[in-house]
Amino acid sequence: MKTRTRKGAVGIGTLIVFIAMVLVAAVAAAVLINTSGYLQQKSQATGRETTQEVASGIKVERVVGKTDLPYTNIGSDSTELDYIRQLAIYVSPNAGSSGIDLSNTKVILSNGEKEAVLKYAGGPDDDYDAFTKGVQNDIFDLYFKYSSDGTNWNNEHSGLAAWKNLYYTGTNHDPAKNFGIIVIQDADNSLTEDYPTLNKGDLVVLTVLVGSLEEYTGNPSNDDNAVYETGGAKYDYIDVNGNSDTTDTIQGVFGEGIPAGTKITGEVVPEFGAPGVIEFTTPSTYTEAVMELQ
């Protein structure tokens, strides 16, 4: 009897297995390709973020403080310098840093007893931005002067918006929670009052009112020919006889200000990137109105 061969059946089975293996391999390859593509994109994004975090950041160039000015107003001859009331923090971007949005930057300050977190007093929805642009002959100028004709106050001089709009009535700002900006250098005009973006080559001063102000809120109709002006970091009302009076107090970050021999620490923290470090100890006595602290 003749024996039948089954080679054909075996060949078809092998072909089916082979096709199945090819299909499985194709599906696996597709999964691997998709996964590798996703991982590649994630790694690129992570790399960009890491580069941004490492390269970007803010550098604190220097910190300058201003004490109470000697009171040279009419009716006063005091020359005491008790507290630092204003801080000017000079900052620039790190080398290789991408643009830093100062409206999303925070300033952290601590005197060992209190820590404050400050944000920019301005933005597109703010009518009174604490923002000044251009080189100034006095970066601490918060000086106001009004004269009265018996009916109205006449504005003779206004201080820098970077200072006065931290506390000026109607701004809804709190000098104990906000900082201002003075633009010293900005070649590409990236620093605007609504969107202050710090780029390569830019230099700005962050203004912080660390001490209190005293404000006169009198009625000009009752103060004929009076003068209303600041005496350093205070508001003084000077009447026609040379007598001064002070009333309503505006609080700064550290109450009356920073006394002598006080250690201050803090950071200027951008939205991303390395923060700028603030650390200094004030002198044991204040002998000058303006002094470099860091």
Swiss-Prot record:
UniProt GO MF annotations: structural molecule activity
UniProt subcellular location: Archaeal flagellum
Coarse class of the protein's main subcellular location: other
Superkingdom of this protein's organism: Archaea
A Pfam family it matches: Arch_flagellin
Cleaved propeptide residues: 1-8
Signal peptide: none
GO cellular component, one term: archaeal-type flagellum
GO BP annotations, alphabetical order: archaeal or bacterial-type flagellum-dependent cell motility
Keywords: Archaeal flagellum
Family that this chain belongs to: Belongs to the archaeal flagellin family.
Annotated function: Flagellin is the subunit protein which polymerizes to form the filaments of archaeal flagella.
PANTHER family in UniProt: FLAGELLIN B1
Name of the featured protein: Flagellin B1
